[in-house]
UniProtKB/Swiss-Prot annotation:
Encoding gene, per UniProt annotation: LCE3C
Protein family according to the UniProt entry: Belongs to the LCE family.
Domain of life the protein comes from: Eukaryota
Keywords: Antimicrobial, Keratinization
Expression sites (tissue/organ): Skin-specific. Expression was readily detected in adult trunk skin, adult arm skin, fetal skin, penal skin, vulva, esophagus and tongue. Not expressed in the cervix, rectum, lung, colon, or placenta.
Highest classification ranks of the organism: Eukaryota, Metazoa, Chordata, Craniata, Vertebrata
Gly residues biased stretches: 78-94
Protein name as catalogued: Late cornified envelope protein 3C
Key word Magnesium present: no
Function noted in UniProt: A structural component of the cornified envelope of the stratum corneum involved in innate cutaneous host defense. Possesses defensin-like antimicrobial activity against a broad spectrum of Gram-positive and Gram-negative bacteria, both aerobic and anaerobic species. Upon inflammation, may regulate skin barrier repair by shaping cutaneous microbiota composition and immune response to bacterial antigens.
BP terms from Gene Ontology: defense response to Gram-negative bacterium; defense response to Gram-positive bacterium; keratinization; killing of cells of another organism
Length: 94
């Protein structure tokens, strides 16, 4: 009888950590970023660290765009569009 109890106690642990781990991670990760993103409405700069939707990609693009815009636009490569070239570009900027 003692053996059966020991075997049963060994089987439940491996079954618990598997299902308990996956749901806990995504559940806790989904709510915080979703709330921050919705509140920011696409302009979550400091929230990107928390894992905002596309804020991280946008933040990075903004940095590269600023640098490229200064280099490309200054040279006259994207001066044609002026303010329009900001959103109209093959690389995201000019």
């Amino acid at each position: 009888m003692s053996c059966q109890q020991n075997q049963q106690q060994c089987q439940p642990p491996p079954s618990c950590p598997s299902p308990k781990c996956p749901p806990k991670s995504p559940a806790q990760c989904l709510p915080p970023p979703s709330s921050d993103c919705a509140l920011s409405s696409g302009g979550c700069g400091p929230s990107s660290e928390s894992g905002c939707c596309l804020s991280h990609h946008r933040h990075f693009r903004s940095h590269q765009c600023r640098r490229q815009r200064s280099n490309s636009c200054d040279r006259g490569s994207g001066q044609q569009g002026g303010g329009s070239c900001r959103g109209h570009g093959s690389g995201g900027c000019c």
